[in-house]
Amino acid sequence: MEQNEREKKGAGAPNSAKAIVEALLFAAGDEGLSLSQIAAVLEVSELEAKAVIEELQQDCRREERGIQLVELGGVFLLATKKEHAPYLKKLVEAPGASPLSQAALETLAIIAYRQPITRAEIEEIRGVKSDKPLQTLMARALIKEVGRAEGTGRPILYGTTPEFLDYFGLKTLEELPPLPEWADDGESEREADLFFEKLAENLSDGQPEYGKLKKNG
């Protein structure tokens, strides 16, 4: 009886379970979900949850699917396929594409200069949540997951992509303009704001025409 009830709620209906897992992973975004989290939501064993995940992975491998289900450091998440990168690049560089917001520029600048870096570290520097800017930058293929940090939860590490270099007319990261000195002994809120303004200015200089960033000095 208990087994029947569990099947009604979870993996007893494979198609429904796959759809639920896909929805969960979409909602989780770039943080993804662990096997235990997925199993808990489906109210099934981890073995049953893994079977559903594997079926969904197989579905995503079909040519007509634009996303893939990947496992990174024990966490499952949805990601675009590498073969679609040229089209994502076109989206970024399209004349009608909306410019990056100030929040996205700040986040991108921090990643560019501090990579590899976690979301928590980005938010510590910015002082605000950075989920939406990260999602925007991931969607535009300007940043990517480059690994997992050590420690509790093994958070995702972010880094820039080749598309980032193309977007700002750079050949390598070494061509990034030098930053103003950043003191570690604490600064006023105004000085922190100026720091971010400088970062955004450095990056946005190349934004309209995707030209080379200006170097200081």
Swiss-Prot record:
Pfam families: SMC_ScpB. GO terms for cellular component: cytoplasm. It comes from the Bacteria. InterPro entries: ScpB_csome_segregation, WH-like_DNA-bd_sf, WH_DNA-bd_sf. Keywords: Cell cycle, Cell division, Chromosome partition, Cytoplasm. It is found in: Cytoplasm. GO terms for biological process: cell division; chromosome separation; DNA replication. Signal peptide: none annotated. Homodimer. Homodimerization may be required to stabilize the binding of ScpA to the Smc head domains. Component of a cohesin-like complex composed of ScpA, ScpB and the Smc homodimer, in which ScpA and ScpB bind to the head domain of Smc. The presence of the three proteins is required for the association of the complex with DNA. Belongs to the ScpB family. Participates in chromosomal partition during cell division. May act via the formation of a condensin-like complex containing Smc and ScpA that pull DNA away from mid-cell into both cell halves. NCBIfam families: SMC-Scp complex subunit ScpB. This is Segregation and condensation protein B.
